[in-house]
Swiss-Prot record:
Reactions accelerated catalytically: pyridoxamine 5'-phosphate + O2 + H2O = pyridoxal 5'-phosphate + H2O2 + NH4(+); pyridoxine 5'-phosphate + O2 = pyridoxal 5'-phosphate + H2O2
Organism in which the protein naturally occurs: Mycolicibacterium vanbaalenii (strain DSM 7251 / JCM 13017 / BCRC 16820 / KCTC 9966 / NRRL B-24157 / PYR-1)
GO biological process, one term: pyridoxine biosynthetic process
Taxonomy of the source species: Bacteria, Bacillati, Actinomycetota, Actinomycetes, Mycobacteriales
Pathway field: Cofactor metabolism; pyridoxal 5'-phosphate salvage; pyridoxal 5'-phosphate from pyridoxamine 5'-phosphate: step 1/1; Cofactor metabolism; pyridoxal 5'-phosphate salvage; pyridoxal 5'-phosphate from pyridoxine 5'-phosphate: step 1/1
Residues where substrate binds: 11-14, 79, 136, 140, 144, 205-207
Protein name: Pyridoxine/pyridoxamine 5'-phosphate oxidase
UniProt similarity note: Belongs to the pyridoxamine 5'-phosphate oxidase family.
């Protein structure tokens, strides 16, 4: 079997009102104020993806660009959603941190394959406040805090053993420290919700797409 045939077998037909019981996405799902209604709908869809069995439904694929204008993507975990946008936390010295410093704009996609839905958010990127970072940091498991100190994210390393040695050294360093401080190179980013698009898979690839931009709402052709 050729590769194209193999991939063709993976095709999935999306649902309809009759098939999956979910009504067609429409602009009224955003409520009377789309500028904030998108937040409610995103939370709702995330919860429904979790109920359907999606692993880490807050996972989002974040795209940045490198110094040659080429797109780079990776999956991160969304840690807050409000009218201002969506946030995530990372090492500021990582590849994505360096790229955002040079070109502070990004897009994020929540891909909920189990329920045939996606949400796209894109806009300018800013660092969250030190207070917000400290608050989130304090809620992280101690092991995750140690990992953030141990890893020089995105830099090459000789082996797994070398990485674990760095973790051991950091663990010993903070052995008698009850509250591990936030690393100076670590914190959050907020992707502003300049544009938000909701996508719902439908039969025959005639999907539903609703876009919110600057408080304006429009339906897009699939």
């Amino acid at each position: 079997m050729g590769t194209s045939d193999y991939l063709a077998r993976m095709r999935v037909e999306y649902g309809s009102v009759e098939k999956d019981g979910s009504s067609d996405l429409d602009v009224d799902w955003l409520g009377p104020d789309p500028a904030t209604g998108w937040v409610t709908l995103l939370h709702q869809w995330m919860a429904e993806a979790e109920q359907a069995g999606a692993a880490e439904p807050n996972a989002m694929v974040v795209a940045t660009v490198d110094d040659r204008g080429r797109p780079v993507t990776r999956t991160v975990l969304c840690k807050s959603v409000d009218a201002s946008g969506v946030s995530f936390y990372t090492n500021y010295d990582s590849e994505k941190g360096r790229q955002l410093a040079a070109a502070p704009y990004a897009s994020a996609t929540f891909p909920w394959y189990l329920v045939g839905r996606q949400v796209h958010v894109h806009g300018a990127v800013t660092k969250v406040s030190a207070e917000e970072t400290a608050d989130y940091w304090s809620k992280r498991p101690r092991g995750s805090q140690l990992g953030a100190w141990a890893s020089q994210q995105s830099l090459p390393i000789a082996s797994r053993a070398a990485l674990m040695q760095q973790l051991t050294e950091v663990t010993e360093r903070f052995a008698d420290v009850e509250e591990i401080p936030v690393p100076p190179h670590w914190g959050g980013y907020l992707i502003a919700a300049e544009v938000v698009e909701f996508w719902q898979g439908r039969e025959n690839r005639v999907h539903n797409r609703i876009r919110v931009c600057g408080g304006q709402v429009e339906r897009l052709q699939p």
